[in-house]
């Protein structure tokens, strides 16, 4: 769930649930989110009902969230498996972000500063995967997940 505007080719309900800031704040106040955070004026969060429904169906749930959100999840689900995706370097991360051509210069700089702060918190995660090669990182993540099944 997010309050940011959809990017080109993103579909509501598939990529994210796009909502207004008022709707998001109502979800926070009602305790409907398992985690949430704010970045550059936009809110991002995960509805509890979405996660609970999947878990009750016996499914595993994969969340792509930032460090504070992951900490909130672990507080609520202590046996959650956490994996920190470590970029090869901040220079490479910058190259990747700029390559998307979806962010202003200000947001690129904010993303890099946030990444530098988050990289220092990798020890909060059960696993760290170095994301220098997509295929290798994907295989390593799959192996970690298989070890818990």
Model-derived segments and spans:
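Conserved nucleotide-binding/hydrolysis micro-motifs of P-loop NTPases
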Residues: 2-6, 67-69, 87-92, 134-135
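ATP-dependent small-molecule kinase phosphotransfer cores
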Residues: 2-61, 68
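A short acidic, helix-capping loop that chelates divalent metal ions and anchors anionic groups
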Residues: 5-11, 92-95, 101
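Conserved catalytic network of the ASCE P-loop NTPase/AAA+ motor domain
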Residues: 8-9, 53-56, 74-78, 120-122
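Residue-level signature of catalytic and energy-coupling elements of molecular machines
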Residues: 24, 62, 115, 129
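Conserved phosphate-donor/acceptor-positioning beta-strand/loop module used by diverse small-molecule
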Residues: 61-66, 75-99
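NTP-dependent small-molecule kinase module
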Residues: 79, 95, 99-103, 117-149
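Glycine-rich S-adenosyl-L-methionine
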Residues: 105-113
């Amino acid at each position: 769930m997010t309050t940011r505007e959809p990017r080109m080719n993103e579909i509501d309900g598939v990529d994210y649930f796009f909502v207004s800031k008022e709707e998001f704040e109502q979800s926070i106040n009602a305790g409907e989110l398992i985690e949430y955070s704010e970045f550059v004026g936009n809110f991002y969060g995960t509805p509890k009902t979405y996660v609970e429904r999947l878990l009750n169906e016996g499914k595993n749930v994969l969340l792509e969230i930032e460090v504070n959100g992951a900490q909130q999840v672990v507080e609520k689900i202590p046996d959650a498996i956490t994996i920190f995706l470590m970029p090869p370097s901040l220079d490479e991360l910058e190259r990747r972000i700029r390559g998307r051509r979806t962010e202003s210069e200000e947001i690129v700089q904010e993303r890099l500063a946030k990444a530098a702060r988050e990289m220092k918190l990798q020890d909060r995660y059960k696993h760290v995967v170095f994301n220098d090669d997509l295929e290798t990182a994907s295989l390593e993540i799959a192996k970690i997940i298989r070890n818990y099944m």
